[in-house]
Amino acid sequence: MIEASKLKAGMTFETADGKLIRVLEASHHKPGKGNTIMRMKLRDVRTGSTFDTSYRPEEKFEQAIIETVPAQYLYQMDDTAYFMNTETYDQYEIPVVNVEEELKFILENSDVKIQFYGTEVIGVTVPTTVELVVTDTQPSIKGATVTGSGKPATLETGLVVNVPDFIEVGQKLIINTAEGTYVSRA
Protein backbone atom coordinates (compact mmCIF):
# COMPACT_ATOMS: atom_id res chain seq x y z
CA MET A 1 0.00 0.00 0.00
CA ILE A 2 1.17 3.51 -0.77
CA GLU A 3 -0.12 6.77 0.68
CA ALA A 4 -1.41 9.50 -1.63
CA SER A 5 1.26 11.87 -0.29
CA LYS A 6 3.97 9.53 -1.69
CA LEU A 7 2.51 9.35 -5.22
CA LYS A 8 4.63 11.03 -7.90
CA ALA A 9 4.31 11.55 -11.65
CA GLY A 10 4.87 8.29 -13.51
CA MET A 11 3.71 6.00 -10.69
CA THR A 12 0.85 3.56 -11.26
CA PHE A 13 -1.66 2.38 -8.66
CA GLU A 14 -4.87 0.37 -8.47
CA THR A 15 -8.06 1.83 -7.01
CA ALA A 16 -10.50 -0.06 -4.78
CA ASP A 17 -12.80 -0.63 -7.78
CA GLY A 18 -9.99 -2.22 -9.83
CA LYS A 19 -9.06 0.70 -12.10
CA LEU A 20 -5.41 0.97 -13.06
CA ILE A 21 -4.38 4.63 -12.73
CA ARG A 22 -1.15 6.42 -13.75
CA VAL A 23 -0.17 9.69 -12.06
CA LEU A 24 0.57 12.43 -14.62
CA GLU A 25 1.00 15.30 -12.14
CA ALA A 26 0.87 15.47 -8.35
CA SER A 27 1.13 18.43 -5.99
CA HIS A 28 0.47 19.23 -2.34
CA HIS A 29 -2.11 21.94 -1.74
CA LYS A 30 -2.63 23.64 1.62
CA PRO A 31 -5.81 25.72 1.69
CA GLY A 32 -6.04 28.67 4.08
CA LYS A 33 -8.20 26.63 6.42
CA GLY A 34 -8.33 22.90 6.72
CA ASN A 35 -6.05 20.02 5.96
CA THR A 36 -3.55 19.52 3.18
CA ILE A 37 -4.84 17.78 0.06
CA MET A 38 -3.07 16.14 -2.86
CA ARG A 39 -4.18 17.50 -6.23
CA MET A 40 -3.51 15.09 -9.08
CA LYS A 41 -3.91 14.76 -12.79
CA LEU A 42 -4.45 11.07 -13.50
CA ARG A 43 -4.91 8.78 -16.50
CA ASP A 44 -6.95 5.58 -16.53
CA VAL A 45 -4.41 3.24 -18.14
CA ARG A 46 -7.01 0.99 -19.75
CA THR A 47 -9.29 3.64 -21.27
CA GLY A 48 -6.75 6.44 -21.78
CA SER A 49 -9.08 9.04 -20.23
CA THR A 50 -7.50 11.73 -18.06
CA PHE A 51 -9.08 13.45 -15.10
CA ASP A 52 -8.22 15.74 -12.20
CA THR A 53 -8.96 14.76 -8.62
CA SER A 54 -7.78 15.31 -5.08
CA TYR A 55 -7.04 12.96 -2.19
CA ARG A 56 -6.26 13.29 1.48
CA PRO A 57 -2.50 12.65 1.97
CA GLU A 58 -3.16 9.65 4.24
CA GLU A 59 -5.41 7.80 1.74
CA LYS A 60 -3.85 4.50 0.70
CA PHE A 61 -3.74 2.72 -2.64
CA GLU A 62 -2.40 -0.58 -3.89
CA GLN A 63 0.77 0.18 -5.83
CA ALA A 64 0.74 -1.67 -9.16
CA ILE A 65 3.72 -3.92 -9.89
CA ILE A 66 4.92 -2.94 -13.33
CA GLU A 67 7.44 -4.96 -15.32
CA THR A 68 9.39 -3.49 -18.23
CA VAL A 69 10.97 -5.11 -21.28
CA PRO A 70 13.26 -3.54 -23.91
CA ALA A 71 11.45 -2.72 -27.13
CA GLN A 72 11.63 -0.74 -30.34
CA TYR A 73 9.01 1.66 -31.68
CA LEU A 74 8.06 0.45 -35.15
CA TYR A 75 5.34 2.76 -36.50
CA GLN A 76 1.93 4.33 -35.97
CA MET A 77 -1.11 3.52 -38.07
CA ASP A 78 -4.44 5.23 -37.43
CA ASP A 79 -5.05 5.12 -33.65
CA THR A 80 -2.52 2.37 -32.89
CA ALA A 81 1.23 2.45 -32.18
CA TYR A 82 3.24 -0.70 -32.89
CA PHE A 83 6.22 -1.84 -30.81
CA MET A 84 8.49 -4.90 -30.91
CA ASN A 85 10.12 -6.67 -27.97
CA THR A 86 13.84 -6.66 -28.88
CA GLU A 87 14.49 -9.92 -27.02
CA THR A 88 11.60 -12.14 -28.19
CA TYR A 89 10.59 -10.18 -31.33
CA ASP A 90 6.95 -10.24 -30.18
CA GLN A 91 4.96 -7.28 -31.50
CA TYR A 92 2.55 -5.22 -29.40
CA GLU A 93 -0.22 -2.85 -30.39
CA ILE A 94 -0.90 0.04 -28.01
CA PRO A 95 -3.71 2.59 -28.49
CA VAL A 96 -2.19 6.00 -29.27
CA VAL A 97 -4.25 7.64 -26.48
CA ASN A 98 -2.24 5.58 -23.96
CA VAL A 99 1.15 6.71 -25.31
CA GLU A 100 0.51 10.07 -26.99
CA GLU A 101 2.84 11.98 -24.62
CA GLU A 102 5.67 9.48 -25.20
CA LEU A 103 5.23 9.55 -29.00
CA LYS A 104 6.23 13.23 -28.97
CA PHE A 105 9.78 12.12 -28.11
CA ILE A 106 10.39 9.03 -30.24
CA LEU A 107 10.97 8.31 -33.90
CA GLU A 108 10.48 5.04 -35.74
CA ASN A 109 13.09 2.44 -34.66
CA SER A 110 13.74 4.26 -31.35
CA ASP A 111 14.56 2.14 -28.30
CA VAL A 112 12.00 2.27 -25.48
CA LYS A 113 10.75 0.06 -22.67
CA ILE A 114 7.27 -1.47 -22.72
CA GLN A 115 5.44 -1.61 -19.39
CA PHE A 116 3.39 -4.65 -18.40
CA TYR A 117 0.86 -5.11 -15.61
CA GLY A 118 0.69 -8.89 -15.46
CA THR A 119 0.31 -9.82 -19.13
CA GLU A 120 -1.41 -6.55 -20.07
CA VAL A 121 0.63 -3.92 -21.98
CA ILE A 122 -0.09 -0.62 -20.27
CA GLY A 123 2.45 1.86 -21.58
CA VAL A 124 5.88 2.86 -22.76
CA THR A 125 8.88 4.44 -21.04
CA VAL A 126 11.15 6.66 -23.15
CA PRO A 127 14.81 7.49 -22.40
CA THR A 128 15.42 10.50 -20.10
CA THR A 129 16.90 12.47 -23.01
CA VAL A 130 16.48 12.14 -26.78
CA GLU A 131 18.10 13.73 -29.83
CA LEU A 132 15.70 15.38 -32.27
CA VAL A 133 16.23 17.64 -35.31
CA VAL A 134 14.69 21.12 -35.59
CA THR A 135 12.32 21.26 -38.59
CA ASP A 136 10.94 24.77 -38.12
CA THR A 137 11.90 27.87 -36.15
CA GLN A 138 12.36 31.59 -36.67
CA PRO A 139 15.68 32.58 -38.29
CA SER A 140 18.61 33.38 -36.01
CA ILE A 141 19.38 37.03 -35.44
CA LYS A 142 23.00 38.14 -35.57
CA GLY A 143 24.19 39.23 -32.17
CA ALA A 144 21.53 37.20 -30.36
CA THR A 145 22.68 36.36 -26.87
CA VAL A 146 22.00 33.36 -24.68
CA THR A 147 20.29 35.62 -22.13
CA GLY A 148 17.23 36.12 -24.35
CA SER A 149 13.90 34.50 -23.60
CA GLY A 150 14.24 32.14 -26.54
CA LYS A 151 11.94 31.18 -29.37
CA PRO A 152 9.66 28.22 -30.19
CA ALA A 153 11.08 25.44 -32.37
CA THR A 154 9.19 22.55 -33.95
CA LEU A 155 11.06 19.23 -33.86
CA GLU A 156 10.81 16.29 -36.26
CA THR A 157 8.19 14.53 -34.08
CA GLY A 158 5.96 17.62 -34.02
CA LEU A 159 6.97 18.56 -30.47
CA VAL A 160 7.35 22.32 -29.92
CA VAL A 161 9.97 23.44 -27.38
CA ASN A 162 11.40 26.79 -26.38
CA VAL A 163 15.03 27.09 -27.55
CA PRO A 164 17.76 29.76 -27.41
CA ASP A 165 17.79 32.35 -30.21
CA PHE A 166 20.92 30.89 -31.88
CA ILE A 167 19.26 27.55 -32.76
CA GLU A 168 18.58 27.05 -36.49
CA VAL A 169 16.57 24.65 -38.67
CA GLY A 170 18.41 21.36 -39.21
CA GLN A 171 20.30 21.37 -35.91
CA LYS A 172 20.09 18.30 -33.68
CA LEU A 173 19.07 19.04 -30.08
CA ILE A 174 19.06 17.07 -26.84
CA ILE A 175 15.60 17.18 -25.24
CA ASN A 176 14.68 16.29 -21.64
CA THR A 177 11.70 13.93 -21.97
CA ALA A 178 10.48 14.33 -18.38
CA GLU A 179 9.93 18.07 -18.80
CA GLY A 180 9.80 18.40 -22.59
CA THR A 181 12.53 21.03 -22.54
CA TYR A 182 15.69 21.91 -24.48
CA VAL A 183 18.93 20.73 -22.83
CA SER A 184 21.66 21.48 -25.39
CA ARG A 185 22.79 21.02 -28.96
CA ALA A 186 23.84 17.46 -29.78
Curated annotation (Swiss-Prot):
CDD domains: S1_EF-P_repeat_1, S1_EF-P_repeat_2. Signal peptide: none annotated. One of its GO terms (molecular function) is translation elongation factor activity. GO terms for cellular component: cytoplasm. InterPro entries: Elong-fact-P_C, NA-bd_OB-fold, Rib_uL2_dom2, Transl_elong_fac_P/YeiP, Transl_elong_KOW-like, Transl_elong_P/YeiP_cen, Transl_elong_P/YeiP_CS, Transl_elongation_fac_P. Pfam families: EFP, EFP_N, Elong-fact-P_C. Its main location: cytoplasm. GO terms for biological process: peptide biosynthetic process. Transmembrane segments: none annotated. It is found in: Cytoplasm. The keyword Ribonucleoprotein does not apply. Keywords: Cytoplasm, Elongation factor, Protein biosynthesis. Pathway: Protein biosynthesis; polypeptide chain elongation. Involved in peptide bond synthesis. Stimulates efficient translation and peptide-bond synthesis on native or reconstituted 70S ribosomes in vitro. Probably functions indirectly by altering the affinity of the ribosome for aminoacyl-tRNA, thus increasing their reactivity as acceptors for peptidyl transferase. PANTHER family: ELONGATION FACTOR P (PTHR30053), ELONGATION FACTOR P (EF-P) FAMILY PROTEIN (PTHR30053:SF12). Belongs to the elongation factor P family. NCBIfam families: efp, PRK00529.1. This is Elongation factor P. The lineage of its organism: Bacteria, Bacillati, Bacillota, Bacilli, Lactobacillales.
